Amino acid sequence: MERVRKNFATADNVLEPPHLISMQRISYEEFLQIDRAPEEREDVGLQAILKNIFPINDFNGLCSLEFLKYKFGEPKYTVQECQQRGMSYEIPLKIVVRLITFDVDEETGVQTIRDMKEQEVFLGSLPLMTADGVFVVNGTERVIVSQLQRSPGLFYSHDNGKSHSSGKLLYSARIIPVRGSWIDLEFDIKDVLHVRIDRRRKFPVTTLLKALGYSSEELLREFYPLENVKLSDGKYWVRFVAEHTAGQRLEFDLVNPQDGEILAKKGRKISKALCRKAVEAGIEFIEASSETILGKVLASAITLAGAEEPLYPCNTEITETVLENLAENGINEFETLFMDGVNYSASFSHTLRLDKVITTAEALLEIYRRLRPSSPPTLEIATTFFENLFFNPDLYDLSEVGRYKINAKLGLKTDIEHRALTRDDIIYGVRYLVRLKDNQGGIDDIDHLGNRRVRTVGELVENQYRMGLVRMERAIKERMTLQDVETLMPHDLINPKPISAAIKEFFGTSQLSQFMDQTNALSEVTHKRRLSALGPGGLSRERAGFEVRDVHPTHYGRICPIETPEGPNIGLIVSLATYARVNPYGFIETPYRKVENRVILDDIRYLSALEEQKQIIAPALVALEADHQSISEGNLIAREEGDVITIGSDNVTYMDVAPNQMISVAASLVPFLENDDANRALMGSNMQRQAVPLLVTAAPLVGTGMERYVARDSGACLLSAGDGVVEEVDSNRVVVRYDKPGVDGYDTGVAVYRLTKYKKSNQNTCFTQTPTILPGLKVEKGTLLADGPGCEAGELALGKNLTVAFMPWRGFNYEDSILINERLLKEDAYTSIHIDVFETMARDTKLGKEEITRDIPNVSEDTLRNLDDSGIVRVGAEIKPGDTLVGKVTPKGETVLSPEEKLLRAIFGEKAQDVKDSSLRVPPGVTGVVIDAKVFSRKGVDKDERSLMIEDLEIERLEGDKRDELRSLKNGVCRELGELIAGNTALGDILDSKGELLISSGDKIEVVHAIAIGFHRLKDIDFSGMADCTDRMDAAYERYQKQAEVIAQRYDGIIERQKKGDDLPPGVVKMVKVYVATKRKLSVGDKMAGRHGNKGVVSRILPEEDMPYFANGDTVDIVLNPLGVPSRMNVGQILEVHLGFAAKNLGAQLEKLAEQYAVEEIKAKLSRVYSDSEYHAIIDGKTDAEVIDWAYRHRKGLHMATPVFDGAEEAEIRKLLIESGVDKGGQSQLYDGLTGEPFANLVTVGVMYMLKLHHLVDNKIHARSTGPYSLVTQQPLGGKAQFGGQRLGEMEVWAMEAYGAAYTLKEFLTVKSDDVEGRTTMYERIVKGNNFLTTGLPESFHVLVKELQGLCLNMELIEE
């Protein structure tokens, strides 16, 4: 039964958190489309790439290879087999292709089909994702982390005035495709607009526009409005356009042409009102001075009648000479460009003037020269090159996201499927940039989540697969030309190696393919929900600035502002918020409830950062009316465009779905997070991921209600796949018979769940499952069947609930040190199991095969005491450093034999051949018990006794599972048939399976009789008198036969694989893996932490009698330093301690009441503590005995849930403290265990959830007496891994000098370090008892001399 927690939440639970790893699973499912029929597959993922690359045509157009469909085979091994054998869990991919050959008529050039060949071709294997969202690669579980990347599209920015000393803003734009050339547009300090393609040399943007087919005149008309100027009676008149004229001053009086009235005097500023008057008066032109006309620019070329060349080309600046020439030639009307220096500057006109290119052909050639300087172009080559650069969908891809972004930015209506650039994209993009420079529009914020998208697993693998396919395409084209196509079949052309190599490289070595963090269930879930800005195509740590790393307003509800690593990756690796999801375009969406006129609708919508911009969003904890259906009247605090504003509730359009919507899963596991400083909250949420699963788990008394979701979705716990009945339970497996067949993925209706026992995780912690269900119980979909590591009752349980006192204790909790009660060690409270795996391989060497054997030369029998006859350590053996785990001998090189040895060889045969001991031994620092040994032998090699024994045990286990599954199936059919015949009268005597009388003739048949009769005898009984019965029985039998066959085939396949040899790496004959479990108790030096960033190291484990104790004699478990709280500002831990104290004492009260069998008092107590719904969930349907049992099971404390941002108030905690019978201030009188005296002040005491972290002192501490030396310097190596020594550095030398210990120092620096001769002499002298020190020269001095000689400086030692 699911645990009921006392929940302090006030907000309605409108939306359950989604499945926490659905992002990974959905993405990869969409990539493979494995469950869809070929004809139903959409053009995404694998289908899209294959359709994109195929058809592949040869260079002469004589043959074509077309893609028809793809299909998948069955995985060769199960996930568990892959992990044991070090294989990859993958699925074979086959494609059906058609090879068409053509005949070409040489005269007409018409193609006719000569031949068509269709064939299914193997295209390599693809890694398959497990149900938990991980990939098994070479036996290890890996996660593909999603990447946060700048979205493709069009972006505008400026340099913040940093490029030039004047501080002038230089604007730029960039068009980023997914595949293809980048376009950069940028203004220089002189306001000339340049373009760069792929960051090459820049050239004027007008060259690019002319290459698109625009003439200079068309370009000017695109960028500027036109003004009409005419000359009459020696005066210049400019056409009146209200928008252009507003804000200017009149040079002459403005006269109404109809009645001559002066509407405005000269010198007056033209207002909007005056513009309206002028329009009403029908004024078409206003008078302008010649000075005004000077400096304007001609919009079109002016050509005299009959002349070929224009008098003045367009874009000519008007000077006095130009005006005189125009008047002389009788040109009284012309068009100019409107430039006011505010909304329309001269920059584009100026750029066009600097551009020497005139025609489209010249522009194309110029661009070709810039990008391909070496080869001389022809117009045809240049045109094709330019078309391929941006407009060929095969070579340039904006992706749907890029197209969507460009359409949104420029207001275009281009079809979303059109993924190459268009002329409009470029011209409107340039126009937007010119307007931007003229202060119209705004730049893009690159850290806005509307401009950053997530590339999930599916997309990352898709990109990799495309690279492999492109390589394969090249190879296919070459083969088509080199070989005779008529005789070829498709499989002769297709070689899947480039694809397999690309996929292997990605999964094995990519920065985004990571070794899964498997320390506990939470670290698994968090790793799968992680987003990284690093990796190929992303940022690098060195170049990422502060802005990219910082929290952005659009992160709200999408990316957690708290959970990110400390150190160089801060802000670059982040976590998805609890309710967030990724939409098909890769943008992160978060759910909101729709609000209209203050009424909250049932409609929940997911909005991306861009869609959210125009909305006004209220928080989840906003004041509601009594019916909880609408928001209260008045002002409230809401969010709009990233700002927090106060606004009337009538204006709200959406509201949050949950208070913890903005934070990640790990952060939402911290109770009272709202009372912690952000830095400590970050540490708290990060350190939970490092907690080691303990031997005995306990869920936190003070939780947040999120614990069960993490346990449910991590895959650590075993859940029921559907409704059914538990048939059988033991410590190794659970058998469930489901009501409907097909629930468990097989069409049998029976599932044997084999629990994972003592499996090594990636971080060497122990992964083991414990059943929590009883046989005969009914289960529903999602019912907990077994708890995983670090879980209890289906909830995450990473630590222990400890009674904590905040007080100094004789300096042992100085600087965050922790004082621990020895009782915790006796109770194994913080004991964890860690599993190491050691493996060795017997290889086939040049000198002969290595052999795994117990027969090892020159080794005592005592050393081999734990090995069996095959030379492999027995399971259950206790081992310590240096013990032999697997005996192995390697042949030595052939030596020249003496006559005596030849004689021995002749007498004793090969046995006397030289072999050396290369056994696998336990490394330093490892002690424990051998829990398993696995032997893998190459196919065709005889298996040893141990291999056969392991194989027999495994086959026996599988046969047992098969029997149980068939028995459950039979019982199910018997029950079904029993229900069918129940109530009918027996036509004759019916015997049971043992042959004894069960039902006499004429008696009524009941359901239970069917099982007693037995499955096989049921069908021999005459049921002819019952209508429809025989047919239905036959159908049931037929179904049983089919289902039994499915079960038999499945198990037989696994058993067959067990009997076969194993696939081992080349040259390996046999491989042995030995698993050693180590029990780690809590010890001094271990790191512990709470959930609020309060971490420390165990400084002393104090005997129970010396610990501070309460008046009733109970001792506290742990003593923490009170000074660790105020400066860290993580007050959440104090609130947790108080609430935990209330929870614990309520449990103690329930225990007393249970002992007194006071059922009514228990119910009264529970009704005061819990809400009505929680109370009924606990009490309803329970007998008095069950209520007592419930109370007794909760004797250690009642479980509370205080959700983040919606948790327990101070008054509620006080109320519970009073209810639990302790001081409402949460302080108690403690007594000193050493003296028995009471402490002077009251002490804050309570219950805190403390974790043991993965930084265990046993893994870090290390000492050496003798060991390996460095070859060059002859000094001991450094570090635990190398079994190195302790470094005696320069500071230590100074210390020795300060004490004047010259001889000791000399000994340190010579014979104890790298004086080779001195070392040997010293050893001899100690052996002979002549302890007198003589030293030589340290080896490092010789190294220094050699180094100097390398610099051509000869140095000789003069010994006198």
From Swiss-Prot:
UniProt-listed Enzyme Commission number(s): 2.7.7.6
UniProt GO MF annotations: DNA binding; DNA-directed RNA polymerase activity; ribonucleoside binding
- Record the organism: Desulfotalea psychrophila (strain LSv54 / DSM 12343)
Q: A Pfam family in this protein? A: RNA_pol_Rpb2_3
Keywords tagged on the record:
DNA-directed RNA polymerase, Nucleotidyltransferase, Transcription, Transferase
Q: Known InterPro entries for this protein?
A: DNA-dir_RNA_pol_bsu_ext_1_sf, DNA-dir_RNA_pol_bsu_external_1, DNA-dir_RNA_pol_su2, DNA-dir_RNAP_su2_dom, DNA-dir_RNAP_su2_hyb_sf, RNA_pol_bsu_bac, RNA_pol_bsu_CS, RNA_pol_bsu_protrusion
Instruction: Summarize the protein's role.
Output: DNA-dependent RNA polymerase catalyzes the transcription of DNA into RNA using the four ribonucleoside triphosphates as substrates.
What name is this protein filed under?
DNA-directed RNA polymerase subunit beta
An example Gene Ontology CC term for this record? DNA-directed RNA polymerase complex
